[in-house]
Regions:
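Gram-positive cell-envelope targeting signals
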Residues: 1-77, 123
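C-terminal or late-domain output modules
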Residues: 4-7, 12-15, 55, 77-78, ...
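Hydrophobic beta-strand residues in large extracellular and virion-surface proteins
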Residues: 23, 107-109, 121-125, 188-190, ...
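Solvent-exposed, acidic/flexible segments
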Residues: 50-53, 65, 87, 91, ...
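Stable alpha-helical elements in mature extracytoplasmic
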Residues: 53-60, 68, 93-97, 140, ...
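Short solvent-exposed beta->alpha transition segments
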Residues: 74-149
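Short Pro/Gly-enriched beta-strand edge/turn motifs at strand-loop
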Residues: 93-95, 165-172
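Short beta-strand edge/turn micro-motifs at domain boundaries
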Residues: 142-164, 175-221
Length: 222
């Protein structure tokens, strides 16, 4: 009787052992699946957030290409466009010329440094744009010729007339002088503020690109 009972319990233990192993294996698989999902979710969230400063920079560059100053300002953390104050690009007389120039700008994002912990990033754009140095040179040369002719006739131009004549000459020369492209890399610091990613400030390099490497045409002739 005792021998039979012992054999019975031994057989029962043998039967239970594989079941325990299967349960452990199943539990491990579930744990690994959950772990993979958590990691994938975290990585997905990181890359989703990482795209936000890149998209902000692209929007900024598109507004820059369209000369949409209000659009650029809305994407600036500083909300300050004063870097354009001394640039010809803000003059209504030159709007048509600079729009044609900036439409030819192209860019691509080449590098991104993203810090999710403190909500900062830096996005580097490689920009190809018109170098207007030759257009400027031709414009000023022609303008000075016309000024000499005007002076000999005893006439003088008002500041408004001077600006308008320069604007007309710029458009004429831009249609006859062959486009000369140049390239540059600009790194934009981007920061998260109130749930939105914004460019920190309007920098001098961006102004130079938008102005086609021009300084100030009236400064050149004064």
């Amino acid at each position: 009787m005792d021998t039979n009972n012992q054999e019975f319990f031994e057989d029962e233990e043998v039967q239970k052992t594989p079941v325990r192993k299967k349960k452990k294996k199943k539990g491990l698989i579930i744990f690994l699946v959950i772990l993979v999902l958590v990691i994938a979710g975290g990585a997905g969230y990181y890359f989703y957030e990482r795209q936000k400063p890149i998209e902000t920079t692209k929007d900024y560059l598109e507004n820059m290409r369209a000369m949409n100053f209000d659009g650029m300002k809305a994407l600036l953390q500083s909300n300050d466009m004063s870097a354009l104050d001394d640039a010809d690009i803000t003059s209504n007389a030159y709007t048509s010329f600079f729009k044609k120039i900036n439409e030819k700008m192209s860019y691509k994002i080449t590098k991104t440094s993203f810090h999710i912990q403190n909500g900062t990033a830096s996005v580097t754009a490689h920009i190809r744009y018109i170098d207007g140095a030759n257009i400027y040179k031709e414009t000023i040369t022609e303008f000075l010729k016309q000024i000499v002719s005007t002076a000999f006739s005893g006439s003088t131009l008002t500041e408004e007339e001077t600006e308008q004549k320069l604007a007309t000459l710029l458009e004429e020369k831009s249609s006859t002088v062959e486009d000369k492209f140049t390239e540059t890399d600009i790194t934009y610091p981007v920061i998260e503020a109130d749930g939105q990613w914004k460019i920190v400030t309007l920098d001098a390099d961006t102004v130079r690109v938008m102005s086609a490497n021009f300084t100030n045409v009236q400064d050149e002739i004064d």
